[in-house]
Amino acid sequence: MASATQSQAEPLIPEDIAYQPGPRPVSDTTPTSLPPPVAEPEPDAIRMEPPVAPTDTCKRQSPLRKTLTLTSFTRLSPHMANAGGLHELEQGLPQLLRDELMQREVISANLLNQGIAQEATEDQRQRQAQELARRHHTQFVLAGSILDMTMDDPGRQYNPGLWQGAANLFHDLTTITSRDKRTRQLALYLELRDGFTGEALLSRRYHTQGIWNQQGAPRFNSAAFHRSDYGKAIYELVGQMGEDLANTLACQPFIAAIDAAPGRPQVIIDSGANQGLRAGDQMELYQLLVVPSQTRYMASETRLIKRNSRLQLQEVYPSHSTAVLVDGQYLNGAFLAISD
């Protein structure tokens, strides 16, 4: 059974570009009686609210395809993959997630062979995400860390006694797993970050487990791995992670970098027809500013400031577009084009 623990579910995009829900419509009917009074909680009581899924807070979704860089996952211990030779899990899981997201048609993504160390500080992870997004021209960066993939009792599979070997054979022939104790864990941590600000949009821990009864080294994503109970549990977990990521990404505004030269009326937008842009589209203009942090010593924060001007796309190519400011002004500094 797969499970997920959310530590930071709400998107941390700047408040001035986040969608603000309008007032709830007033019902046409008037209640005939007042609702019963609600008891006030005691002063020392703490009320725990359940986490709200991203789809519940998203009132409108951009039809444009966001861009995502997926890094290889890091592994907490190199020895966890020895059983079964599952050393390709670090690259295999991000690849499965990329395929899952692209099937949902919410992103265009690329996959890297490098990862972001989770033991790094928050400032370091922010800077790494910004650098990867800038280098690979993407809006988001996904990183992960494999925390556990050990067997509860490896001896039951790899060094069984006479009776344990007979029990293993019975379970393998009958495919009855309710009393099979050859359980293997998978726990991992996912972190989705905005590539322009480096802020975390989704931080969540996932866990699943299954029976691992494979001999030798079948390798990750092989036919034998597909047939295993452990493999099926992982594929189910990938589907859950893909749904969570797709919901979070769908609620974010579409943002693309702008290449503007001083005194040049035409600018280049770092997105094009592959993301769904069309000639004649208009986009909001935001300035990208780096300011000293008010809460962290010797640190900086990235802010997006909305400008009273709009961009109109003139020519759209597969990977980029050209545009001009509607009011004919010139740009000087770092700017972003945004469509919600």
Sequence positions of predicted segments:
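A structural "domain/chain start" motif
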Residues: 2-106, 110, 219-224, 251-267, ...
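N-terminal segment of the mature soluble domain
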Residues: 63-154, 199-203, 278-281, 286-302, ...
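A generic structural motif
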Residues: 74, 150, 196, 210, ...
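Surface-exposed short loop/turn segments
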Residues: 123-196, 294, 301-302, 315, ...
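Short secondary-structure boundary motifs at beta->alpha junctions and helix caps
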Residues: 170-187, 193-235, 292-312
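Short, structured interface segments
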Residues: 226-252
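A structural micro-motif recognizing beta-strand termini
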Residues: 263-279, 324-329
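Beta-strand/loop-dominated core regions that host nucleotide or nucleotide-derived cofactor-binding catalytic loops
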Residues: 285-340
